[in-house]
């Protein structure tokens, strides 16, 4: 029998395997890098979408609550100014009047209405102030008249009190005179009674003569 021919050992290509392993490692690294890049792109897209949503929400809030003075001109803003200044000083009616070279055609209608409304308010306040001053003056005149009448009444009362004191004094003097006259009359009556008694005793006849 012939000996079987020894089979050649399989060739192992170490270099080719190393190359394939390195190629597989590079492909994995590329895939990882690609996934990281895709994730970063997705995050950026998500952030941009969030920013767009926030901007839309802010614009929606602005649309829901618009600022009334945002798109107004200076002439329109005059309508929202208060009638009285903030510092407390009252502005005169002349300051609120339109300028001498006032042309209604060059101003919006609302501004004219607002200025007229301000002027009407000033006129009403001024008329109320004049009425209040007239009422205060009338009350002052009434108070002055009452004070004068009170002073006159006090003078009359003092005069009456003086007259009453004089009358009381006179009455006291008259009462004293009356009492003195009563005493004198009583003395005279006693003297007359005594004289009559003496006369009767003198006219009576003695008993021996009979």
Curated annotation (Swiss-Prot):
Basic and acidic residues composition-biased segments: 45-54, 62-79
Induction entry: Follows a diurnal expression pattern; levels increase after dusk, reach a peak before dawn, and damp rapidly thereafter.
Region (Disordered): 1-97
Coiled-coil segments on the chain, per record: 29-49, 129-184
Gene ablation phenotype (knockout): Slightly shorter plant. Early flowering phenotype in long days (LD) but not in short days (SD).
UniProt tissue specificity: Mostly expressed in leaves, seedlings and floral organs, and, to a lower extent, in panicle, roots, nodes, internodes, leaf joint and sheath.
Superkingdom to which the source organism belongs: Eukaryota
Cellular component GO terms, alphabetical: nucleus
GO BP annotations listed: flower development; regulation of flower development
Entry keywords, A to Z: Coiled coil, Flowering, Nucleus
Localisation per UniProt entry: Nucleus
Function description: Regulates flowering time via a photoperiod-dependent pathway. Suppressor of flowering that upregulates HD1 and down-regulates EHD1 in long days (LD), thus leading to the down-regulation of HD3A and RFT1. Triggers OSK4-mediated HD1 phosphorylation.
Subunit structure: Interacts with OSK3 and OSK4.
Protein name listed in UniProt: Protein HEADING DATE REPRESSOR 1
Lineage: Eukaryota, Viridiplantae, Streptophyta, Embryophyta, Tracheophyta
């Amino acid at each position: 029998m012939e000996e079987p021919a020894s089979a050649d050992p399989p060739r192992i290509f170490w270099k080719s395997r190393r190359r394939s392993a390195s190629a597989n490692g590079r492909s994995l690294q590329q895939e990882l890098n690609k996934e990281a890049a895709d994730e970063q792109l997705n995050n950026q897209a998500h952030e941009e979408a969030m920013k767009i949503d926030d901007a839309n929400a802010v614009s929606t809030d602005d649309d829901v609550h618009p600022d009334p003075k945002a798109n107004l001109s200076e002439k329109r803003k005059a309508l929202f100014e208060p009638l009285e200044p903030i510092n407390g000083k009252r502005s005169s009616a002349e300051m609120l009047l339109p300028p001498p070279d006032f042309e209604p055609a060059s101003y919006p209608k609302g501004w004219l209405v607002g200025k007229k409304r301000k002027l009407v308010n000033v006129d009403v306040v001024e008329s109320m102030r004049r009425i209040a001053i007239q009422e205060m003056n009338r009350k002052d005149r009434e108070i002055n008249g009452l004070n004068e009448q009170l002073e006159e009444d006090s003078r009359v009362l003092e005069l009456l009190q003086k007259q009453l004191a004089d009358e009381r004094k006179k009455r006291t003097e008259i009462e004293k005179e009356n009492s003195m006259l009563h005493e004198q009359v009583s003395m005279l009556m006693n003297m007359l009674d005594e004289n009559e008694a003496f006369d009767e005793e003198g006219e009576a006849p003695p008993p021996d003569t009979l």
